[in-house]
């Protein structure tokens, strides 16, 4: 399996540490093997240098030239609809669900537990019905045994 997310000009990343945690930024320039110049004009992140360890690369990419100014980055961001694509992405939905789970009250966690128990009970019942039906009519072998290997 090959990598699909490379550090490149225009690659959109999510800040995972620091004051801009959770905000999206675009890589404007690569400073060295450890740092990049990033800018997030639509997410209110000022242009600054960030360590790659602070960034999580996404599948999104905006097209703009090397070392582009903030205005150019903003136009490319809006043209490629990066914010809209991010909201529709699997990772963004997963992060939103995790945040929602953090804000649940004790009673809401209890209701969730009961709903999961009811769902699992239904699955168990249906699986039992399938198992019972399979025992009544055993499955036929798909191929005949090899006579050379199984001598009687």
Curated annotation (Swiss-Prot):
Cellular compartments per GO CC: cytosolic large ribosomal subunit
Keywords: Ribonucleoprotein, Ribosomal protein
Family annotation (InterPro entries): Rib_uL2_dom2, Ribosomal_eL14, Ribosomal_eL14_dom, Translation_prot_SH3-like_sf
GO biological process: ribosomal large subunit biogenesis; translation
Coiled coil: none
Classification via Pfam families: Ribosomal_L14e
Molecular function per GO: RNA binding; structural constituent of ribosome
Family: Belongs to the eukaryotic ribosomal protein eL14 family.
Protein name: Large ribosomal subunit protein eL14
Lineage of origin: Eukaryota, Metazoa, Spiralia, Lophotrochozoa, Annelida
């Amino acid at each position: 399996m090959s990598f699909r997310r490379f550090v490149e000009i225009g690659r959109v990343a999510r800040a995972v540490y620091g004051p801009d945690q959770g905000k999206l930024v675009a890589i404007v320039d690569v400073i060295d093997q450890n740092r990049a110049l990033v800018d997030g004009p639509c997410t209110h992140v000022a242009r600054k240098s960030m360590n790659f360890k602070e960034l999580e690369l996404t599948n999104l990419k905006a097209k703009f030239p090397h070392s582009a100014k903030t205005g150019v980055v903003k136009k490319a961001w809006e043209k490629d609809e990066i914010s809209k694509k991010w909201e529709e992405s699997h990772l963004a939905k997963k992060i939103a669900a995790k945040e929602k789970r953090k804000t649940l009250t004790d009673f809401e966690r209890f209701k969730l537990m009961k709903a999961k128990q009811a769902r699992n009970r239904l699955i168990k019942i249906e699986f039992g019905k399938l198992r019972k039906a399979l025992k009544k009519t055993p499955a036929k072998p798909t191929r005949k045994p090899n006579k050379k290997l199984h001598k009687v």
